[in-house]
């Protein structure tokens, strides 16, 4: 079970961990988190026992490389619509011979250089870092089997953007979206991929039934909004009850 951080707040991360969330999604596609903040969130989450996933904005080398140096467990690439996009992602994120990741001896991802053998540590990181490609367009769904056949990547499903791409924006349980999602899940399973998904609460049961490996079901902004709404509703009801009893 995972939850997303859309802004930098260590307190939220600790609360999420204590509540039992096991994976922290650090959002850098839509939100304004910096790489320095992302690295801090990785440190904090790791200290609480949570896994971390950074979603970058695109597969430009500087984005992939800086995210990788933060030391997350997962890097997620949105809009991974073509094999070429995915191969470029791998090239930037993996050390040779699997990719062409730039040499940097002291990142958090390599324990700041406190390793017996840097080449061995790089190969260990190659094996441990999960690269997720986000399937969230009709184009990507059509290429699902081809994309899932690429070695060294796992799959993240984006039902919200997928619904828009399929012409039914916001209708994440529409038959078109469900059919596409199930196609992706089957392809991912066939190729031995891990599957993650970001889901609104009403859809959680559907995704749980699909047997996804990581289910993100909330974010910090939504938690603040829902909590504030609940407090306001209860306080307003108390005030209304007081007025009613006074007038009586």
Across the structure, where does each feature detected by a protein language model lie?
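Catalytic cores of alpha/beta
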Residues: 14-18, 59-73, 77, 82-86, ...
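Short beta->alpha connector loops at strand-helix junctions that form conserved
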Residues: 27-29, 56, 77-80, 159, ...
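Conserved anion-binding
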Residues: 62, 74-151, 161-164
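Glycine/Thr-rich beta-alpha phosphate-binding loop at enzyme active sites
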Residues: 159-176
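Structural preference for beta-strand elements that scaffold enzyme active sites
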Residues: 2, 22-23, 51-53, 73-76, ...
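Conserved N-terminal beta1-alpha1 strand-loop-helix module at the mouth
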Residues: 1-52, 57-59, 91, 131, ...
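Alpha-helix-loop-beta-strand connector modules within alpha/beta enzyme cores
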Residues: 35-69, 91-99, 123-126, 173-195, ...
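C-terminal helical cap(s) of enzyme catalytic domains, especially alpha/beta-barrels
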Residues: 41, 83-99, 169, 221-245
């Amino acid at each position: 079970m995972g939850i997303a951080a859309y802004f930098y707040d260590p307190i939220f991360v600790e609360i999420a961990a204590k509540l039992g969330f096991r994976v922290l999604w650090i959002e850098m596609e839509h939100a304004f988190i910096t790489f320095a903040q992302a690295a801090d969130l990785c440190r904090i989450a790791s200290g609480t026992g949570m896994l971390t996933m950074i979603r970058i904005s695109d597969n430009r080398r500087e984005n992939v490389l800086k995210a990788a140096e933060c030391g997350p467990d997962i890097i997620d690439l949105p809009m991974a619509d073509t094999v070429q996009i995915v191969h470029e992602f791998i090239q930037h994120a993996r050390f040779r011979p699997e990719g062409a990741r730039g040499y940097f001896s002291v990142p958090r991802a390599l324990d700041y250089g406190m390793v017996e053998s840097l080449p061995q540590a790089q190969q260990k990181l190659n094996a441990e870092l999960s690269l997720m490609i986000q399937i969230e367009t009709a184009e990507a769904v059509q290429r699902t089997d081809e994309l899932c056949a690429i070695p060294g990547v796992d799959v993240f499903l984006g039902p919200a953007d997928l619904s828009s791409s399929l012409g039914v924006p916001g209708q994440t349980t529409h038959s078109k979206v469900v059919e596409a999602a199930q196609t992706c899940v089957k392809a991912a399973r066939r190729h031995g991929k891990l599957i993650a998904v970001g889901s609104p609460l009403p859809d959680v049961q559907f995704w749980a039934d699909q047997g996804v490996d990581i289910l993100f079901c909330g974010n910090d902004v939504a938690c603040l909004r829902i909590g504030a709404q609940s407090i306001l509703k209860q306080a307003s009801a108390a005030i209304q009850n007081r007025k009613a009893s006074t007038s009586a």
